Amino acid sequence: MAGNIVKWWKHKILGGYKQFTVLQECATDSEELIYPGRAPSACSAPPDLLLTSDREQMLKVKSSASTGSGTGQTKTSFQHSHHHHHHGHHHQSPSSNGHNHSGTSHQQQQQQQHHHHHKSQKDAFRKCTNGKAGGGNATAGGASGAGATNTINTTAATIRSDPDRVRLEEFTCDVSLEDGKKPQPLQFSFTLYDLDGHGKITKDDIAGIVSTIYESIGKSVVVPHYGSKTINVRLTVSPDGKTATTKPASAAVKKAIITPRRRYRSRKLISDDDGSDTSENCPRLLRNRTAATAVTNNGETANNNQAALQNQQQQQQQQHHHHHHHHSNGSSGKLKESNLSKATALAGDNQVNRSIGLSNSSEGSSAVGQLLVEAYHKNNLSPGAANAGAGKGVLNNAPNATKSKANENVYESINNLKCCNLQQQQQQHTASNNTSLQTTASSLPVTATGLNQSTTSTAALICHDCVDGGAPTTTLLPPLSTLETVVIPAPSAGVTGRAKRKLVRKTRASRKTAIAAKMMSEDFARRPRARSLSVGNENCYENVIGRMAAAQEECWKSSLCRRELIEIIRESMVKNSLCFQPNRRKEHHRLAAAVGATRSTQPTPVKLSTALLNQQYPNLSAEQKLTRSINQVEQWLDHRSPKLVPKVKLADDMQLQRTVVSRPLKRSKSKEELTPSNLLLLENLKISEDIAEIAVVTPKKVYNKESLIASATKKNIKTHHQHQHSPSRQPTAVPTVAIGAEKPSAPLTVVNKQSIPVGDAQLVQLQYGSVPINADPSECENLIRMSDDGEDVEQHQHQQHQQQQQTAPMAATKHSYRHHQPQSRSQPQSPQHHQHHHQQEPRYCGSGRAHSVSSASAASTTAVHRYVHEHIHHHYHHFENDPDES
């Protein structure tokens, strides 16, 4: 199938390069812009979280793995397989570019399909890639095949695991156009924020990335008619607290790809300690195997493959590395520019390079992702003589093999940074460290070539970062320190300028590497980076040198920054009515608990935090909140609270009112003002119960009339007896207005607005529709208004006091007052109200509760509305408007 796909893509590309996605139902145009023939994202489904990166990685890794299906050499195999595969397809395809593109498209399609059909596609790709890789390069293909299989499996595993562990991550997109052999590097840093909490990358996210790239380079890129142009796009995803594995699994392919071909290489930065063991380790193992394909890291094809691969790879990469090396030299700027991402991807490539023993120069610069690898790569260069420096000559093949093995080990130690092969790497990196130090030191001069130097400097930078960041990593640290020591010469080797450039890019890679190393080696390393809040700017290209020193700190800071960002975003989200209900619920539970704790006596009113209120009333604009002035709220409360307040309470309330009257908030009719503390306790209990219940039931206090009323009808009466139990709810200090509907007739039962007069509680806890609401009196206006009429008689007396206090709500007050005076009158108007009054008194006794429940269920909404209209038209209208507003 893979062969057919490749052929199909070949024809598509050669027959006229058409950008369309094969298996992408959900692909976006922008995505397709980036991935011309590839399905960039196979639908941003949760499994696709990193699938975009995974997909890209898979394109690299899987396609390369498919191309070079192997267990240990995903990158190597991708590189070799692709490299060879591309060569094979070069032979097959009219043009190597077309072939490469075709191969890329094939890989893309494979990845797409693979992405959609991870297993079957992987197998098919694996087979196809294996065949191709095998055909292209027996040794590389074989080793690659092994690596590719692992990589594919790894990718699959990673993809499988990633949905669980995938986090939006920082995407560093290095786009390089190769015009002639000159790369035109561009770097983009995309920070994706998981604002919706699903932790998945959406097509829009990728589309934005693609759009950015397209806008940056799309218009400037001219693709020959029926020809192909290679756009090397490396998409690296900073690991979610996991090492960034460079799964662009093709150094050789990359080189081959350097030929016109669209490469979208995404590093699988999610080195799953779990799934990545397969994927990351496989890439790493693949790198190790690839790099050490003979390096006996896996001991499988290690030595033979290494010799063969190194020889072949050296030769091939000397071939390609020559032309790639030239490309890489020509594209060294590109590599350097995109070196960070590429280095990350090329970390795998370097692994490949190591296993290939190939071009440190071309891949070396791209080794940035794995500066250690780069150092190792350079080590390979030294031992491998660059795989002869640029793969240009096998300077020291025997030493290269030996050093290469040692370097492989070192690289494995690097992989330890990159992956969980810590044991082998630990074992190996000790010996390898020495070798790699030596080889790195030697290879640095060998790779003193600008590209390699920059790579080396990059490696040094990353090594520093890794060493700094990886220092916690015992395994990585020795190799890192060793590499660091060696690498330090590299940057000092006159690579400093490039090192700075790369360092900028490498900083991210080094950060990632260091972070990965730390994460890998430490629990701190395990500390996932805030998934959605990875800030690409932390990896600013500036502070390149500072990054080396800061890399370690950044490893720590990045999480802190992300956490801060998360908090900031969360706050903004809350402000934007994107309240986190779990938090709100927690708050409510806390409040309820506190209320329960203090229920025995009227708790001291406690103001609810504005944050709580905002969460509860996410929709209220500041204007609305302000508009609902406390005076208005107090007016409503004044009208309403008397209704709820029993006459005994009225007396207390009068006292409270008198107190309240002196209070600036005269209007606050809150029963709390008027109501004696015992009444407050009643209502507090009611409120606390309702709130606790609401906290659980309706985290988002929805204040629509219907919902509130419905809730109220359910919970109206509930806490009247409870007030004895949980006056502590009042402790929330919000003058509590139980608006709600203990009884449908009194849906707007006003819980005592406990101390609006007191002043401690500016917040009113409204119980509307049995939904206790902690809110400012202004916010509670609507609910309070509705509850006014529910307690006409009680409020009548209260209102008398309140009216004395307030004239502003005179009409309403009179209206309520009227209801209060002839409680029977208001009751006849609303039989429910009648019941409500009967219940109001019993309701505090708890009898009203059952009644309100029954009536609530029966007439809940209609009764409430009717009652409200009859008793508080203006209030009702306000309520009607305000709840809608709120």
UniProtKB/Swiss-Prot annotation:
Q: Which residues form the EF-hand domain?
A: 181-216
One biological process GO term for this chain? negative regulation of canonical Wnt signaling pathway
Gene Ontology cellular-component terms for this entry are: cytoplasm; nucleus; plasma membrane
| Record flagged with keyword Nucleus | yes
| Signal peptide range in chain numbering | none
Enumerate the subcellular locations listed in this protein's record, separating them with semicolons.
Cell membrane; Cytoplasm; Nucleus
Low complexity: bias regions: 62-79, 93-112, 823-832, 846-861
Question: Which keywords does the record carry?
Answer: Cell membrane, Cytoplasm, Developmental protein, Membrane, Metal-binding, Nucleus, Wnt signaling pathway
Region listing for Disordered, in residue ranges: 62-149, 267-286, 307-338, 789-861
Which domain of life does this protein belong to? Eukaryota
What biological function has been recorded for the protein in this entry? Cell autonomous antagonist of the canonical Wnt signaling pathway. May activate a second Wnt signaling pathway that controls planar cell polarity. Required for neuroblast specification.
Name of the protein in its database record: Protein naked cuticle homolog
